[in-house]
């Protein structure tokens, strides 16, 4: 069984970004690490549902939308409610957005030229990162750290 595409890259990127954040922001993330980790997967987390389902289609639509209104609305709620949980989620989601925005032009170009499919390129990128960081791609499942809870869903919605 191959690893889930892109999961490890987003987790690793979030870990690396974390080291550059202010102590105050790191504290917010430490207190709400599960929400941060869920945010790291952005709308990709919706792709793990049944193919062609409403949930999966929502993830596809979210990838095509302009992100600014999403972040503006989220940060408005953070400021209004002083909501550190939502802030941690949005920080993770921002990491997801930054990594996708940087990598996807190359991914799309390779897929368009039929060099390699989008999903396979992302899987291979994850596999390479796992090997470079000492993880066995066939025994390491980075998504195991994503813990679904109704309380997290309420924060996100």
Model-found features: residue ranges?
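Long, charge-rich alpha-helical interaction segments
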Residues: 137-157
């Amino acid at each position: 069984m191959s690893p889930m595409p892109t999961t490890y890259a987003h987790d690793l990127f979030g870990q690396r970004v974390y080291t550059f954040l202010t102590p105050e922001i790191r504290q917010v993330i430490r207190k709400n690490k599960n929400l941060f980790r869920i945010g790291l997967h952005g709308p990709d987390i919706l792709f793990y549902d049944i193919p062609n389902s409403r949930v999966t289609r929502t993830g596809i639509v979210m990838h095509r939308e302009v992100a600014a209104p999403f972040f503006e609305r989220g940060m408005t709620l953070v400021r209004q409610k002083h909501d550190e949980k939502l802030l941690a989620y949005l920080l993770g989601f921002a990491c997801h957005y930054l990594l996708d925005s940087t990598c996807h032009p190359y991914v799309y170009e390779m897929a368009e030229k039929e060099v390699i499919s989008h999903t396979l390129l992302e899987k291979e990128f994850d596999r390479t990162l796992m090997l470079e960081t000492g993880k066995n791609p066939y025994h390491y499942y980075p998504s195991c750290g994503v813990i679904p809870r109704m309380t997290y869903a309420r924060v996100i919605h």
